[in-house]
């Protein structure tokens, strides 16, 4: 990111002059080196293409047909549930069965997987167990082909994008062919995965923005509005498929900010026009993606109205509206003597849980109290008053009111909800929470005062109700408040979330808010929660996204165990650790996620060299060398910053992530890198090989890429013979194609 900012500041002045010249319609002329010996650089096309003729359509069609072959050839050869088909196939089933689930990714791409299953006639009964053969009634070939069509589209999208960026036809064809002949892009489009839709929508976003820039000189025209709106639509689709789409939003956001700042500095643009430019981009690039993203989650909730495996991740109010949910089938009232479960209003914590076997390792032998996601029998507490007699569900009804002092007795262990003098294990403030004492030894340390914060039902505030009442619990002796955290305890605490008692000045947060999720009390009748609880789309969308983020952050690599599928970001551009996708048994149809080495290494070289090129030419320009015709360096920067910036923004953030990473996370960045490679070849060919026909240069590059693709194609289309026969394809010793010192 720092490199991006440095390059932006270095070229901002040049770009502003270029835009101002265009606004004032200044003429341009060729320039030569001050010594008279240097030939001025130029980009082969003078203007960006804003329309497609018949030849462009024919070339795009030919590329599409070739893409269809590479993505669909023998796609049903492996009739076994392979790799992450286990997850995404089963997630698709949830939509067919309408049962709620939880995952780390937004739902759009999984909805498309579900659509493929529905169109193929599935009834949602197949569980997609890893390694099991597909039964006859599952048309897995259709499902894979449906998903593969998104991978097919990125090839013609690449051609169209390059034409809008000013590539000549030969080099636009070359760029699309690079995308066509990359083995990793191809193989990841051939299974029931999310990568193909993600790549398709990423390519669509780049295409839309490139087309929009081609109409930059025609502001507020029909085509200008169409492509600006289509950019927002594409950004909404890509971020609704995977959060990697946020990098595409960041790219368009940075470039849009730069453009608006340049327009702001242009004296020829009136203030009213400035406001129109800002308003158009707010509507199309912020509002449209936000509406699409929220709408996708609204559809997600509508399609999954039945209780499922993931409902425990959602707040109690959401669960109360799910069909077949235990939260919806209980009383609304609660009183002393009721058995209750306590849920935090902090996403990621869950319910307060106690287990007799979970103990602190520092000599304190009290039971750990922590947050757990699922509903378990050790989550239940008896709500009792300060009287010496412990109430139960046969006692006279006495409701819990705001300001009451209460105790919580855990009948599973015979202990009380209690705080003490010890510091929490992870959190650096507050007091430790534990289950202490016994059924005959209550203490002031387990006496809590109820502070009702809000009531989300039509019932009057001031009394405790199930699901709808949010409240705080303040310890009567210490004055600290019961507070949830998302800090996980070590393995001795089963990775559960730590529970603490925070000082009073730390309690005005959602983490100190609680509600009763379930109640057991035969004194009360079952309530109709559909009349008591409101549907809150925005709240549920924010909640589920926070849960997704927390789950995603907890997907960390285990440093004590080697996993052949994992790899670090620094290794991706150099293709050091390709990935086995399936079993490597001799009779298994084997697939290897290895990219086209020629394309990966060449594109990496271009991505590393591009900032150095810009720095070199800027330094020469400061020394009064005229290596470029007027406006040409800015055009080189305009196109290069879009492609290089896309690569950098889709790649470099992975170095900051703590979660486990895989080589397929690099594929969106690779798409930008391949187009940048083609752009560099076009520029270098025009500068240093002007006498060689462009089609000849493009044909040589495409032939080389195609030959390497064919060489590795057995690993892309499936290899069902002993892998030793392909030992010659292990180009690097780090590859685990043929030899690997670890068992898989």
Language model region names:
Residues 141, 145-166, 204:
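Transmembrane-helix motifs of polytopic, lipid-linked glycan transferases
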């Amino acid at each position: 990111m720092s490199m991006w900012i440095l390059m932006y500041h270095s070229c901002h002045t040049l770009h502003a002059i270029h835009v101002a010249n265009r606004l004032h319609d200044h003429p341009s002329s060729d320039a030569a080196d001050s010594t008279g010996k240097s030939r001025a650089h130029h980009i082969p096309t003078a203007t960006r293409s804003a329309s497609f003729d018949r030849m462009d359509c024919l070339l795009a069609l030919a590329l599409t047909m070739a893409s269809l072959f590479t993505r669909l050839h023998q796609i049903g050869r492996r009739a076994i549930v392979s790799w992450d088909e286990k997850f995404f196939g089963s997630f698709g089933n949830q939509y067919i069965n309408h049962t709620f689930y939880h995952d780390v990714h937004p739902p759009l791409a999984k909805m498309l997987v579900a659509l493929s299953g529905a169109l193929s006639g599935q009834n949602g009964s197949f569980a997609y167990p890893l390694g099991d053969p597909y039964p006859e009634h599952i048309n897995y070939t259709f499902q894979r082909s449906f998903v593969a069509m998104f991978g097919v589209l990125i090839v013609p999208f690449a051609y169209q994008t390059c034409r809008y960026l000013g590539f000549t036809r030969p080099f636009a064809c070359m760029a699309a062919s690079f995308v066509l002949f990359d083995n990793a892009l191809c193989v990841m489009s051939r299974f029931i995965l999310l990568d193909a839709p993600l790549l398709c929508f990423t390519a669509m976003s780049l295409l839309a923005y490139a087309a929009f820039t081609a109409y930059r000189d025609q502001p507020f025209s029909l085509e200008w509005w169409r492509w600006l709106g289509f950019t927002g639509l594409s950004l909404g689709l890509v971020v609704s498929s995977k959060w990697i789409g946020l990098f595409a939003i960041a790219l368009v956001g940075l470039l849009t900010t730069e453009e608006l700042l340049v327009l702001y500095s242009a004296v020829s643009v009136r203030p009213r026009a400035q406001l129109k430019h800002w308003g158009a981009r707010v509507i199309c690039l912020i509002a449209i993606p936000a509406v699409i993203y929220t709408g996708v989650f609204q559809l997600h909730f509508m399609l999954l109205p039945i209780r499922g495996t993931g409902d425990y991740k959602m707040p109690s109010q959401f669960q109360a509206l799910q069909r077949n949910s235990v939260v919806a089938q209980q009383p609304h009232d609660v009183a002393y003597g009721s058995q209750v479960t306590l849920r935090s209003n902090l996403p990621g914590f869950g319910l307060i849980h106690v287990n007799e076997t979970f103990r602190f390792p520092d000599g304190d032998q009290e039971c750990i109290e922590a947050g757990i996601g699922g509903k378990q029998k050790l989550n239940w507490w008896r709500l009792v008053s300060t009287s010496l007699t412990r109430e139960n569900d046969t006692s006279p009804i006495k409701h819990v009111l705001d300001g009451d002092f209460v105790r919580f007795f855990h009948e599973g262990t015979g202990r009380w909800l209690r705080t003490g003098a010890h510091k929490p294990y992870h959190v650096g403030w507050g007091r430790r929470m534990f289950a202490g004492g016994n059924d005959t030894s209550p203490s002031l340390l387990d006496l809590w005062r109820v502070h009702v914060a809000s009531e989300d039902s039509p019932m009057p505030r001031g009394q405790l109700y199930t699901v709808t009442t949010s409240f705080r619990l303040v310890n009567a002796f210490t004055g600290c408040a019961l507070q949830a955290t998302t800090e996980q305890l070590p393995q001795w605490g089963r990775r559960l979330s730590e529970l603490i008692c925070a000082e009073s000045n730390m309690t005005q947060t959602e983490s100190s808010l609680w509600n009763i999720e379930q109640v057991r009390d035969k004194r009360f009748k079952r309530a109709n929660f559909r009349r008591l609880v409101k549907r809150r789309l925005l709240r549920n969308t924010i909640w589920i996204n926070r849960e997704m983020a927390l789950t995603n952050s907890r997907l960390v690599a285990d440093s004590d165990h080697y996993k052949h599928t994992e790899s670090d970001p620094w290794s991706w551009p150099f293709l050091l650790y390709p990935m086995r996708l399936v079993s490597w048994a001799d009779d298994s149809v084997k697939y290897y996620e290895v990219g086209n080495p020629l394309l990966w290494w060449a594109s990496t070289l271009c991505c590393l060299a591009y900032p150095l090129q810009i720095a070199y030419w800027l330094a020469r320009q400061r020394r009064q060398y005229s290596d470029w015709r007027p406006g040409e360096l800015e055009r080189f920067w305009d196109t290069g910053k879009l492609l290089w910036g896309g690569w950098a923004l889709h790649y470099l953030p992975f170095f900051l992530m703590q979660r486990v990473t895989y080589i397929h996370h690099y594929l969106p960045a690779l798409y930008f890198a391949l187009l940048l490679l083609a752009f560099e070849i076009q520029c270098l060919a025009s500068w240093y090989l002007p006498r060689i026909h462009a089609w000849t240069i493009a044909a040589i590059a495409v032939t080389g890429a195609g030959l390497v693709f064919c060489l590795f194609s057995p690993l892309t289309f499936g290899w069902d013979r002993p892998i030793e026969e392909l030992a010659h394809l292990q180009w690097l010793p780090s590859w685990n194609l043929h030899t690997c010192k670890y068992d898989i």
